[in-house]
Amino acid sequence: MSSKDSAHDESDREASKYFNPAFMVLGYLGLIPFAMALLVIFSGKYEFGYLSSEYIVVDPQVFFVTYSVAILSFLAGTLWQQQFFSSHGCEKNLVLSNAVVVTAWVGLVATLVSKAWIQIAVTTNMLGFLVLLARERKAMVLDLTYRKMRHRLTFLVALMHLLMLVFMLPLSR
């Protein structure tokens, strides 16, 4: 390992000492849209909105998938950051992050064309969250608090995706 590498590793460790609590707050607040969509579906309404149907009404399944793609995009960006600011970055991270987001985007477009694709989109998004976590675990240089939070959030998001899939089953209705 060169002196440049050891200095870089030291800055990685040093940065982890300053874990910003906003990460925790924003991370858990980010679960709310997933939970809202599940609650609307669980209630049997299958649409957001308290106004008459003349106004914009959002399908909670489509809302769930679009929000999922947005969050996957944010998380995939962390692999890009590692490429430039961490000694653990590699080209595989760039390719993997792009593949996850593009796959999720294709699933979203397919869902918007025909809702018959929505279960596939929810499944691929769930797998995307798990793949990103697995890849991030190999290169994660941040502190234990962040790692625990990241694992918990990914578990909860994957669980919510599974619940969405269960709610989509014909027997659930």
Annotated model-derived regions:
Residues 35-42, 104-112, 158-173:
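Hydrophobic alpha-helical transmembrane segments in multi-pass integral membrane proteins
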Residues 79-108:
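Helix-adjacent hinge/juxtasegments
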Residues 108-131:
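Transmembrane helix-loop-helix
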Residues 88-98, 123, 146-155:
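Cytoplasmic-side transmembrane-helix entry/capping segments in multi-pass membrane proteins
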Residues 86-87, 109-117, 140-144:
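Membrane-interface helix caps and helix-loop-helix hairpins in membrane proteins
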Residues 136-173:
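Terminal transmembrane helical module of multi-pass membrane proteins
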